[in-house]
């Protein structure tokens, strides 16, 4: 029941399973996923000491090979002497530091210090490597014990265990040839032929040593040697060496492909002719739930212009989260993505919206020249920009034309089983993508420029427009200030005028009131009936007229 539910969940929610990346909408603008892998990070390395014994044990054929051995020693000296000088130059200037406490009882080792004045010029990488070199070096007693053990061994690979120390692996690349071919043939071959055979073998071995340690001649302190290169000096049997080193992790192939196993020179002996290496082989830690997706894009046409969507080549998903992924410190293998450090960093919200299906959030740029893919095979279907390249149905011989309203053409077996595109013949499968992606149904993102010259030109134009906008804003501010001052002045004038009008109006009203008051008094005196004139001796007619 649980298995059935899980199957239904995968079928019904494909985008949820793939980390919320909407592959359906992305395919409409020419972006498809070409693979997914787990994410693993290298953790703290384990260290193992390896000794390359450059001088084989030739006790059984010593009488026939003296000349060849002397010439071989001379050649080895030209390689080992510069490395020895460089190692001594930095190791002799590294001294231990004691604790600063005065108590003898509490005095202890506190670390190491580099005598910079005596050393002179050294880079930060050389100083760091020099400190690590000092910490991995064997003491004099251990070196002498190692010399004695190497002189007595005649095995190609020998495990040497010293008292109180870890196992040391000693390797001699020519010893098997001497033991298995030259020594048994001593009775059938003359002494000269044995010497010549050994001389040729030693010369070839010297060439391998020179190619291996040649780059270390310039900077033997910080130079690292990969285990692949080291295998040539170990006789070519890398599996046996790794087995002897005790490494049997399931991620061995991934670590080898990512070149995670490194070796550094810690000691060179130019008398006994051997080199001591410190080999670091890391373990891997898988970050659960993180999936790395690889993306590829196909260009598409809008009219006569060819565009492609600008998305990163790799992205990482963890549940609903989508992050950018820096593939610089990483290697890709069938076992997953192996990184020497954390390669995830945040993604902008706009780009996250693009991956979640909002095509209007996906920026696009013009195709310059012949840059960009014009077709890609995904889920057995051919996604092609048939407006820019010739698409032909190989089965029928007809040309597959692209509708001007379409930005891409999706070809499956129902349309043409065998397709010839840009001179390549491809057999396609059943339809997985609908061939109905029209321009008017897609919201395309904003156009941007990725070319350095175009970006610089656009930035210059933007700065110029900003300066002009600033000047216009300053002018508008000045106009606003002028209008503000003028409005204040006009308001004052209006208020003064209104005050004067009000005063004049009050005066006029006052004068009118006084005049009316005087007129009313005069009329009262004339019309008062209590005052009668003296009419004595006046005729009746006159009185009547009055």
From Swiss-Prot:
Please give the InterPro entries that the UniProt record associates with this protein: Fusion_F0_Paramyxovir
Coiled coil spans: 134-162, 458-483
**A biological process from GO:** fusion of virus membrane with host plasma membrane
Where is this chain's protein located in or outside the cell? Virion membrane; Host cell membrane
Residues assigned to the Cytoplasmic compartment are 513-546
User: Describe its PTM?
Assistant: The inactive precursor F0 is glycosylated and proteolytically cleaved into F1 and F2 to be functionally active. The cleavage is mediated by cellular proteases during the transport and maturation of the polypeptide.
Gene3D superfamilies assigned = 1.10.287.2480, 6.10.10.110, Head and neck region of the ectodomain of NDV fusion glycoprotein (2.60.40.1690), Newcastle disease virus like domain (2.40.490.10)
Q: Which residues lie on this side of the membrane: Extracellular?
A: 20-491
Protein family per UniProt: Belongs to the paramyxoviruses fusion glycoprotein family.
Q: What is this protein called?
A: Fusion glycoprotein F0
Q: What is the lineage of its organism?
A: Viruses, Riboviria, Orthornavirae, Negarnaviricota, Haploviricotina
């Amino acid at each position: 029941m649980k298995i059935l539910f899980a199957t239904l969940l995968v079928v019904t929610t494909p985008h949820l399973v793939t980390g919320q990346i909407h592959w359906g909408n992305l395919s409409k603008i020419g972006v498809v996923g070409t693979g997914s892998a787990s994410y693993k990070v290298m953790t703290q390395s384990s260290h193992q000491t390896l000794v390359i014994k450059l001088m084989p044990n030739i006790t059984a054929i010593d009488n026939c090979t003296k000349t060849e051995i002397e010439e071989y020693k001379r050649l080895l000296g030209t390689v080992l002497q510069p490395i020895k000088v460089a190692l001594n130059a930095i190791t002799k200037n590294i001294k231990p530091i004691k604790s600063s406490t005065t108590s003898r009882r509490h005095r202890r080792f506190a670390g190491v210090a580099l005598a910079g004045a005596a050393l002179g010029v050294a880079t930060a990488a050389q100083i760091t490597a020099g400190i690590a070199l000092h910490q991995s070096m064997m003491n004099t007693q251990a070196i002498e014990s190692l010399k004695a053990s190497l002189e007595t061994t005649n095995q190609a690979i020998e495990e040497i265990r010293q008292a109180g120390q870890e196992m040391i692996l000693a390797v001699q690349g020519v010893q098997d040839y001497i033991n298995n071919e030259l020594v048994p043939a001593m009775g059938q071959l003359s002494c000269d032929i044995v010497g010549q055979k050994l001389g040729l073998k030693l010369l070839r071995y010297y060439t391998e040593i020179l190619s291996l340690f040649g780059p270390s001649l310039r900077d033997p302190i910080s130079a690292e040697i990969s285990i692949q290169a080291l295998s040539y000096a170990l006789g070519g049997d890398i599996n046996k060496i790794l087995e002897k080193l005790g490494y049997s992790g399931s991620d061995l192939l991934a670590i080898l492909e990512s070149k995670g196993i490194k070796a550094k020179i810690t000691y060179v002996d130019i008398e006994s002719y051997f080199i001591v290496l410190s080999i670091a082989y890391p373990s891997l830690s898988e970050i659960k739930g993180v999936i790395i997706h690889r993306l590829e894009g196909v260009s598409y046409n809008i009219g006569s212009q060819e565009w492609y969507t600008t998305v990163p080549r790799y992205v990482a998903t963890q549940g609903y989260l989508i992050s950018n992924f820096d593939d610089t410190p990483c290697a890709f293998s069938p076992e997953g993505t192996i990184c020497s450090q954390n390669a995830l960093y945040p993604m902008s919200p706009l780009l996250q919206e693009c991956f979640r299906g909002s095509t209007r959030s996906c920026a696009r740029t013009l195709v310059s020249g012949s840059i960009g893919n014009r077709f890609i095979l995904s889920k057995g279907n051919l996604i092609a920009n048939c407006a820019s390249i010739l698409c032909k149905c190989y089965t029928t011989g007809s040309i597959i034309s692209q509708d001007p309203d379409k930005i891409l053409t999706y070809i499956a077996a129902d349309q043409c089983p065998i397709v010839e595109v840009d001179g390549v013949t491809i057999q396609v499968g059943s339809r997985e993508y609908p061939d109905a992606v029209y321009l008017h149904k897609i919201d395309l993102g904003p156009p941007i420029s990725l070319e350095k010259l175009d970006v610089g030109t656009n930035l210059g134009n933007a700065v110029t427009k900003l300066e002009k906008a600033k000047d216009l804003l300053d002018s508008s501010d000045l106009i606003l200030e002028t209008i503000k001052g003028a409005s204040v002045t006009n308001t004052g004038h209006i208020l003064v005028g209104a005050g004067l009008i009000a005063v004049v109006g009050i005066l006029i009203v006052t004068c009118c009131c006084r005049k009316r008051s005087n007129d009313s008094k005069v009329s009262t005196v004339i019309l008062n009936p209590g005052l009668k004139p003296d009419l004595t001796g006046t005729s009746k007619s006159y009185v009547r007229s009055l």
